Amino acid sequence: NDLYINAKQKNPDAYNDIEWQKKNIPFMGELILGHLRYGTYGGNNIQSCHPFRRQNNWMARNLLVAGNFNLTNVDELLEHLVELGQHPTVKADTVTVMEKIGHFLDKENDRLFKQFKEKGLNNFEISKEIQKNIDVASILVESSKRWDGGYVMAGMMGHGDAFVLRDPNGIRPAYMYKDDEVLVVASERPVIQTVFNVDIKDVAELKPGYAAIIKKDGTFTEQQIIEPLERKACSFERIYFSRGNDADIYRERQQLGRYLVPQVLKAIDYDLENTVFSYIPNTAEVAFGGLVEGIDEHVNKIKATEILKLGANVSEPKLSQILSSHPRIHKIILKDAKQRTFITDDESRDNLVNLVYDITYETVKKDVDTLVVLDDSIVRGTTLKQSILRILDRLHPKKIVIISSAPQIRYPDCYGIDMAILSKFIAFDAAISLIKETGKESILNSLYEKAKAELLKPKEEQINVVQEIYRTFTNEEISEKIGDLLKPKDLKADLQIIYQTIEGLHQSCPDNLGDWYFTGNYPTPGGNKVA
């Protein structure tokens, strides 16, 4: 970076002086708060970027907030701010959270000011005492009382205190590392391991309902802020979002692939000789590795059986022929690594998917082979229908089997993932199509009235009636219909879609059982309301 190079060249003697660095080089404070964000419920613009800042001339009243979160009850929280005497101008959970924390930060400042004023201190002395004595935990306890959602909330105060608070269900991930010199909190464990070169055992998970609190003087405490509830850590983090180089996530994604083996073998009628295996996108590579390992085990059992059948008639040619059998694995479809269609805004996604994929030619026997391609998830099906299936069809496979390492995504996420609109899910479209095809439209009218009735109840009493839409059909029936909906009219190959089972998901990711987007079982009352 030119700023650092120029600073060192112009001030070689002062460059290693910490106080000089703080005054002259960017990002050299004791506290650093950064965040990577793209729009989920909010917009993709500079105004949506974290951290958010609440300014004040009093040092201890300044506040920066950044977070990985969505709250489901913004309307309720805004009403509470109005009850407190505020007049919010923006309806957004980021601003609402900042103002809630800011309100109780102001109250804590007022309490301490009064306390030290009564002791006879002047205003300058009082400011210093406030900075030493602010009770960050009590501010967070009061601020978070009505929050409903999944969140890891990080904040810094102008005088130098900082905190990171995790939701009581542990929906959003948070990890921390601490030694004599640094304390770091991040949403992903391998990032901490890489930057600080530390062992996995030295990186701890921030407990649900707890806050990591760092005081200006460097003291650290981990304090319970909210009563922890049933752990429902987000399983989609493990399937797709989080880095695949986390030791546990790597193993879990491999298992997700392994659990698909029986369904895949059935789909190809156990004909491995005429089947080619591949994957898309790159994030599916680890799950694909697990799938291949499972297929390999199946092949090895066949080899062992064939060898035993030879008995005394074993010969080198026969043995070589048996041992030469193995799954056919190719990098069939290539994706531009710079493009990620899942996190592209809806208007751009359709145009983008046609530009980012290409295929490897002469890898498939025309009109003979079945082509099996693993994807980590199928949310909208946009990429498959608009681009991937047509591109794969150019290789002239007899059949295309698309397998998802995630179960069918059936319900909206309201805790921080870009899966917010029910009607855009291909699984929802499939269920609605089946209802109409079987003459059961009355179910939809009944559910619509039930949903309206639920919304009249307090959110704590609401149930997710949308689940009834899917109960009429089996998972296999919905998967088959998804295949019908995603198949382009000009596709020559047969098409089959296979999804991970809920059992396979839970067996693979036993510590992350949050599965509301698959099952509709939301961990907070606000989730049912959103659905």
Spans of features found by a protein language model:
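Phosphate/ATP-binding catalytic cores across multiple sugar-kinase/actin-like superfamilies
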Residues: R146-G149, E252-E273, V286, L291-G294, ...
